[in-house]
Amino acid sequence: MRRLLILSALATVCAVAAAPAYATNECRGLQVCVPVAGPWVLASPGEVQFQLACPKRFVVGGLDAELSSRGIDVGFVGSLGSPVNPGITTSKAAVFLGRLVRGRDSAASFRPHIGCVPASGGGQRTPTAYHAFAPGKPSVRRVSQITVRPGGLRRYVGRCAANEKLVAATHAIGFFGDAPPSASLTRSVHVTQRIAAGRVKLTIRAGRAIAGSRAIVQLDLLCAPR
């Protein structure tokens, strides 16, 4: 049975209010590191999840985030193991967890960052000396990214593989750019989600205000073998 450890901070993780001169720290202390920046993900009082992946043959070695508001709490999902290390606690992708815990900012958002290191630098889990079940990976995440088009309506249906069942589903709205999206921009994208017969149906509506910007919706499915 796989257990997930939600860590609000791990060595290089530091969430700060976004500022034009802020240099993120996802690669701090790492000799070989490829930085990867995600979009500005809209935050709300309900938890939002967003997955950011490393290039092939790399694993997550550091994390950071920019915040448009200090009222946003950001953490990530890590796996159990010892020592807490790239390749053990983290894998080739990181799932960020964001929530607006203070204030009523309708345009609150966070921008996830990961620092990627060569996969060979990660450790391995040490076998235990007894025969109890160690934390495993009974579920898999299926992530889809849908481009949002201005002034239109788009429907998208996501599902797990044929030999899997759907456990949970979440979606997130993101805007790529160096600065957080404005309130008028965030109000221009609306997403509704329905689950029926193991399928997740998204209805995405976008106004003309997003023309000239790059907006996406990420659908995150948690699937398990039947």
Set out the residue ranges of the language-model regions:
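Extracellular attachment/recognition segments
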Residues: T24-R226
